[in-house]
A protein has these predicted regions:
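Amphipathic alpha-helical segments
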Residues: 1-14
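Short, well-structured alpha-helical interface segments that form or flank functional binding sites
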Residues: 3-4, 23-28, 46
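Intrinsically disordered, low-complexity regions enriched in serine/threonine
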Residues: 19, 35-227
Length: 227
């Protein structure tokens, strides 16, 4: 995968990172433009193309538009059709990377940032009051009663709510956009990337969530609640 992608790069694109997941069963390569894009709302992104494939049959070969939020190193694909997916084929022993499809996907890196910037600006224009934010938090992470759960379940939900509210109120990765729908999505995206789950496996888990589409699903859920 790395060699196939490297052979297609032009002068404006470079390989940002590459690696293996699941004990070598999943491979990924991230290609990006050299310059960041700063939106009018002050949210800086770096457009990327993520190429992934698997050697264990767990994932299809996929080219997908994404972006990195520079302020927090979060991955996002907000505003992109099909969550940024531009090419996909089921992995098999006979499957090959078609150069035409790969070149088409790489061309979109140059324009992929426009849709994300447009969505960021749309979200930043939607006001969200503290009361509305609290309602959103309660909907996305409801605290169960002891009749429906045990004390551990109640505590986990309360801790999750507390962590997201702290991001909204005090964390510089979120506070510049607090009071807007952009701040809501950024708070949850940052929580999922940097606070949720065990710290020891965070880097690999975040990348696996990106290549598998889980990050997109988590963001879509927040977007749906905001509507």
């Amino acid at each position: 995968l790395l060699k196939s992608v490297a052979d297609l790069l032009d002068d404006d694109l470079s390989i940002a990172s590459a690696g293996l997941l699941k004990n070598g069963g999943v491979a990924w390569v991230s290609i990006e433009l050299p310059d960041n894009i700063q939106t009018p709302s002050g949210f800086t992104i770096r457009p990327q193309l993520l190429a992934t494939t698997s050697h264990n049959g767990s994932l299809s070969t996929t080219f997908k538009q994404t972006a990195t939020a520079v302020v927090c190193d979060n991955t996002l694909s907000w505003g992109l059709k099909n969550n940024g997916q531009v090419f996909r084929s089921r992995h098999s022993s006979k499957s090959t990377l078609k150069l035409g499809d790969a070149r088409k996907a790489l061309e979109l890196v140059h324009t992929g940032g426009e849709s994300i910037v447009s969505e960021i600006e749309r979200l930043s224009s939607i006001d969200v009051t503290k009361k509305q934010f609290d309602l959103i938090v309660n909907q996305l992470s409801p605290v169960p009663t002891l009749g429906d759960s045990n004390q551990a379940g109640v505590t986990r939900a309360e801790n999750r709510q507390y962590a997201v509210r702290r991001l909204w109120e005090t964390d510089p990765r979120v506070t510049p956009w607090a009071g807007t729908a952009l701040g809501v999505v950024q708070a949850w995206n940052t929580y999922n990337h940097h606070l949720k789950g065990a710290e020891t496996s965070r880097t690999e888990r975040n990348m696996m969530n990106t290549v598998s589409g889980k990050t997109d699903k988590d963001d879509d859920l927040v977007m749906e609640v905001i509507k």
